Amino acid sequence: KYEQLPALNNVPTMQRYFKDNDYYTLSGGKVLHHGFSGRLAGDIDQSLGRTKSPRPSQPLNRPANWSRAWDWGKHPENDTEMADYQLAKNAAKALHEDFEKPFFMSVGFFRPHVPLYVPPKWFDLYDADSFLLPKNPKSDLNDLPENFLGINNYAAAPTHAEVVKHNKQRSLTHAYLASVSFVDHCVGIIMEALKSSPHADNTLIVLWSDHGFHLGEKQHWAKRTLWEESTRVPLLFAGPGIAAGTICSEPASLIDIYPTLVELCMLPKNLHLDGISLAPQLRDPDTPRVYPAITSSYAGNHSIRNRDWRLVVYKDGAEELYNHQNDPDEFHNLAGHPGYKVIRDELARWLPLESAPEFKANSERSRASTRKQSKPH
């Protein structure tokens, strides 16, 4: 839980910071993993609800020895039974309220998290036999450090070998696409409500996901890798002063969202933050950024990603290096090649110098690692 992580003891959530600066705060769904409880309960003025979608009484597709969460299929029958749909409707309704002050609304949709249950009509959008599956050379993992599975083997997810053995890759991918389309519809409900609300012309919108998701790429499923499929997410901004349809190719991190909104809303700077505002790139997407995107997975394992390269360094010193200009799928590990030492060393300057011990909360599944934000060294 957020409130149990020692490194965050004195750090206000984004909701609390905006509330302390005279914003009315609304939140619903999976914004924090365990919700705004304990000392965080007062961060939210109005709840938009946090319910669970129904599950079938029996598994629909998962093999018997797989985790209970790793099931998927056409369930329930209608959108109205889905928690994400109900949340979208609650948020849409709230947008027509008069808050008498600026508002900060956070909406956390559950899908496309497993289990991948959504109503039949979302599956019907796709022909399961027609979409392309990821390229997956059998030799892809041959140039990786011997112990890379130490952090990449996410126990809750099936291995790629298990997915292939049971012939489930296409079926699982179909369910993921259906889930994305369903949640896209939920986002659309809120956007349409905003367009017809009194807040249409003075509201900033940010859309992102908390992590990426492997669908067999690099012979992996789900998350918790330091590769592109797990660490890259959509990040969209819209609103006053932001040009529509522009794309910025500079690296960014999710911790940059907080200081970006603080700057765009002209609030006092929060000195607790490690992120760097993206406001310059929102004004001009060609504005370069000095900082790469730094991702950590468990204590001591880090990825450094700039526009063209990714360096992965594990806590035992093993490394991976990928050239995204020529190898966007990260098939060819260039770590250790003398010709790339200068590039490797430049990226390594950003590696965090200190990692806190892995933190375990009340349950074995609630784990987090923290680090001091890196500056070049």
Which residues make up each language-model segment?
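Formylglycine-dependent sulfatase
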Residues: 1-314, 318-319, 328-355, 359-363, ...
